[in-house]
């Protein structure tokens, strides 16, 4: 199948090797067969002295997958526009592309202004950074809601977002929704920097989302807020924010619930919020690369597998872009039904040719693939049981 350009051979996944060290993390906040769009870029040049910071090499990929439309987007601004920080973000749209289209241009600008051109990032003060980014996200969401209401009364699109500000020594991540970021040490062990904001599952983050939604007057059916949407933090989605009452009336007309049912509903807040979790990771010398992707990847590939694949690809040829495309190919081969967006930032510290070859464990790969799909279904089932209590 002509899924990627250039064509990437299908490679067996390799099991992850022993863990390394080198990072410290702080957290704040609460068809197959479709065309693919891929991009690559590099920031700077390789340092001539070991005391200098090496280059960050970037690879990005967007794959439409089985969806009729492409609602994902990748934004990459490498270089030193923000006091030496590069910016990268993935947006996962739903119910249309309007929200993503707005965010593609506006989120970076608002964050850059709130962060004082990157000066706040350089302080490494997590409280100050969190406050700035949360204000920026709130402003963007308010502006987006106004824009959606003025543009089309029927436009109820939304989008999740994971954005990172990366310098060779530090990483700042801001996140809402169900995209995910991984930070990897030289040993190849992934550390998740973000949590999924979903109204189902038995993890602490999911249970907190369920509690917040119920406190706001919402309910969850089959892992979906009001039986409609399976993500609990996002930009846009005005029917769960400024148009909640209109949503109730529309639901009665469509036969999804009754007048008696909505008479008992008392909304006390937004059911979907845009407040991001913000994390700061100081990057030690053993951190190899950063991997950022939408859930079209993570629902079908475990983080340990993704890390192992990227490391093996870079060991073979050192091409970040080809590694990015190969990772997307694996998700498509596993019948991912969603759009997929991927960003990889190689910090340029690793001599990939010196890494020993990793031996594939085909049995482990098969069982992990089955477990990944099963875990999603199990999480929805557990949340449905909790909703009935």
Swiss-Prot record:
Keyword ATP-binding recorded: no
InterPro entries hit by this protein: PP2C, PP2C_BS, PPM-type-like_dom_sf, PPM-type_phosphatase-like_dom
Compartmental location: Membrane
Enzyme class: hydrolase
CDD domains: PP2Cc
Catalytic reaction list: O-phospho-L-seryl-[protein] + H2O = L-seryl-[protein] + phosphate; O-phospho-L-threonyl-[protein] + H2O = L-threonyl-[protein] + phosphate
Positions annotated to bind Mn(2+) 2: 92, 295, 338
Residues noted as binding Mn(2+) 1 in the record, renumbered to the chain: 92-93
Keyword Manganese (UniProt): yes
Gene Ontology terms: cellular component: chloroplast stroma; membrane; thylakoid
Residue span, PPM-type phosphatase domain: 57-347
Family: Belongs to the PP2C family.
Entries under PANTHER family matching the protein: [PYRUVATE DEHYDROGENASE [ACETYL-TRANSFERRING]]-PHOSPHATASE 2, MITOCHONDRIAL, PROTEIN PHOSPHATASE 2C
Protein name (Swiss-Prot/TrEMBL): Probable protein phosphatase 2C 5
Organism expressing this protein natively: Oryza sativa subsp. japonica (Rice)
């Amino acid at each position: 199948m002509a899924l990627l350009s250039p064509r990437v051979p299908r490679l067996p996944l390799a099991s992850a090797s022993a863990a390394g060290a080198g990072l410290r993390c702080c957290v704040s906040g609460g068809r197959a067969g479709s065309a693919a769009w891929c991009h690559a870029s590099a920031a700077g040049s390789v340092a001539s002295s070991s005391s200098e910071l090496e280059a960050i090499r970037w690879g990005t990929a967007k794959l439409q997958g089985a969806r009729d439309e492409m609602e994902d987007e990748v934004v990459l601004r490498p270089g030193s526009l923000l006091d030496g920080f590069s910016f990268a973000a993935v947006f996962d749209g739903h119910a249309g592309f309007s929200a993503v289209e707005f965010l593609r241009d506006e989120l970076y600008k608002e964050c850059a202004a709130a962060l004082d051109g990157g000066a706040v990032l350089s302080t490494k003060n997590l409280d100050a950074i969190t406050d700035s980014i949360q204000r920026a996200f709130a402003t963007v969401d308010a502006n987006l809601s106004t824009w959606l209401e003025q543009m089309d009364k029927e436009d109820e699109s939304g989008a999740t977002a994971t954005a990172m500000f990366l310098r060779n020594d530090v990483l700042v991540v801001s996140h809402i929704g169900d995209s995910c970021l991984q930070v990897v040490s030289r040993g190849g062990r992934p550390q998740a920097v973000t949590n999924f904001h979903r109204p189902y599952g038995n993890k602490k983050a999911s249970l907190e989302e369920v509690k917040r939604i119920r406190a706001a007057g919402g309910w969850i059916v089959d892992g979906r807020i009001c039986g409609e949407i399976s993500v609990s933090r996002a930009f846009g989605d005005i029917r769960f924010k400024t148009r909640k009452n209109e949503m109730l009336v529309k639901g009665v007309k469509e036969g999804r619930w009754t007048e008696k049912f909505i008479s008992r509903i008392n909304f006390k807040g937004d059911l979907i919020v845009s407040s991001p979790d913000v994390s700061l990771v100081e990057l030690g010398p053993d951190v190899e690369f950063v991997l950022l992707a939408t859930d079209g990847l993570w629902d079908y590939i475990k983080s340990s597998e993704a890390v192992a694949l990227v490391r093996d690809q870079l060991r073979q040829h050192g091409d970040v872009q080809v590694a990015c495309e190969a990772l997307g190919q694996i998700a498509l081969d596993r019948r991912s039904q969603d759009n997929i967006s991927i960003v990889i930032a190689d910090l340029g510290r690793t001599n990939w040719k010196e890494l020993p070859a990793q031996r594939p464990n085909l049995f482990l790969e098969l069982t992990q693939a089955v477990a990944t799909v099963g875990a999603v279904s199990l999480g929805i089932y557990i949340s449905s049981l909790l909703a009935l209590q």
